[in-house]
Amino acid sequence: MNLDRAIQVALSAKRMGHTGPLSTGESLTAALVLNRHDWLTEMDYTIAQALDRIDEDTIPHLADAARNVAEGFDHD
């Protein structure tokens, strides 16, 4: 998943207040970007398991996506 998509799924989940219709990989990415340990727990994943489950090419974008979301970047 590229940076723009990681930001997009995180913002979508943030707006909904949950991961809703997102795929498992997208949901885990959103939870990691938004630092939502409660969502990981609800999905029965640890941080390590989530990192193992998401696409390998997504991992380098997590910190940048979190920074962009925290700064109010809106992909839409």
Task: Place the predicted regions along the sequence by residue.
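Charged, low-complexity intrinsically disordered segments and flexible loops
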Residues: M1-A30, L34-D76
